[in-house]
Each structure stands twice: as C-alpha cells, then as structure tokens.
Amino acid sequence: MSWLSSFFSWLGEFFGTAANWSGPGGIPMRLLEHLEFSALALALAVVIAVPVGLLIGHTGRGEVIVVVSANLARALPTLGLLVMFVLLLGTASIWPVIIPLVLLSVPPILVNTYEGIRGVDPELRDAAYGMGLRGGQVLTRALVPVALPLILLGCRLSAIQVVATTTVAAYTGLGGLGRYVIDGFATKDYASVVGGSVLIVLFALVVQILFALAQRVAVSPGVSQRQKIR
C-alpha cells in the first residue's frame, strides 16, 4: 500500500502548498488557461462540424466525408500533429496547439450530427414536407430537435477528449494544467505530477456533467422519452 500512501502524500503536498494557489503558475490561472484552450478548440470544431454534418445528413451528399472523418479520428496522432505544427508555425502563438485539438474534435461531432439527422424517422420528414415546410425549415424545425441528443453527445465526447488532450499544450511552452505534469516529470516533482493529473481528471468529469445537464435542458421531454423507448 506504499504507492497509495505516496499518492495521497503527494496530493496533500500539492494542494497544501500556498504557492500553488497564486501567481501566473497557480492553480486558478492554469485552470483558466486550460479552459481557454479547450473552449476555443471545441468552439471552432462545432462551427466546422455541425453545419457540415447537418448538410450531409439532410442531403445525403458527401457521405464519404463522414466515413473518412470517422476513420481519421482513430488514426490521428495528436502529439505528432502538435510537433508538426510547432515546426511549421513556431511557438509564438497558441495555434500550433489549437489546430491539432480542432482536428481531434471535429470527427465525433461531424459523425454524430450526420447520424442524428439520417436516423430521424422518414415519416417525420415526410410529415414536415406535407405541412408545407421547405428544405431548410424541415431541417431546423423537424430534424434538428430530434437529432439534438446525438449532436450533443458528439460535442460531449469531443469536449472530454479536448480537455484531456490539452495537456500536450505544455510541450510547446504554453500553459494549462499540463504544465504541472510535464514540468513535474522534468524536475521529478511527483507532487505536481499527481496534483496536475487529478485536476485534469476532475476538469474532464465536470465537463461531462455540464454537458449531461445541458442535454437535459436542451432536449425536449418528448424526444428524450422516445429515445428511452428505443
């Protein structure tokens, strides 16, 4: 049990050190940096993936993009991309980190958005057209509300991936919670490694809970009940 006692000892040392709660390297600032990187990457991914997924799902054209995107999600070496973009763009800005994170985030959102729209009951689509709605109106008023649970699920999966993977931002000299892990290993400060790792896990759990709450608020009870029946 020595490893367990060491774990809690390092954890207590990390969170009990006053210097870790203030200044540019303090926990609040590192959390804010991590949030900024993650939120920017996720927002860009949503702006790219949701419209494309809606368009492909509604028209049925360009489905090969979804297939390629799904396979890409499994094959992307995030750290390799990070190194490549650092070499191409340098470390003077946050974009060498943001671009790989966006590329990592797009596939789950794109695939789930597409699947959500294509999975809507054809009778609902026909009924919407029968009521006189046009293509864009059918999409926004009839299809999107039904597909919303899957779309939000894609966003949640991407958000958790981004929060966890933003740790690699520390490799470029940028901030975020990954600084504790990377710097801790470099200096054999295992209290920082353990504390930073716990913070990253907790951050990911909070993000997951927030998205679950958002889904409960945004999705109509009728759609939720229908999915439970399925």
Regions found by a protein language model. Name each.
Residues 112, 116-151, 177, 181:
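Short cytoplasmic-facing helical segments at TM-TM junctions of multi-pass membrane proteins
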Residues 52-85, 101, 111-115:
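Cytoplasmic-entry segments and transmembrane alpha-helices of multi-pass inner-membrane transporters
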Residues 1-42:
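Periplasmic/extracellular loop-to-transmembrane helix junction in inner-membrane transport proteins
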Residues 60, 115-118, 122, 195-230:
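C-terminal transmembrane helix and the adjacent membrane-cytosol boundary/short C-terminal tail
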Residues 29-37, 86-108, 147-149, 192, ...:
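Loop-to-helix entry region at the N-terminal start of transmembrane alpha-helices
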Residues 39, 135-168, 195, 200, ...:
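Transmembrane alpha-helices
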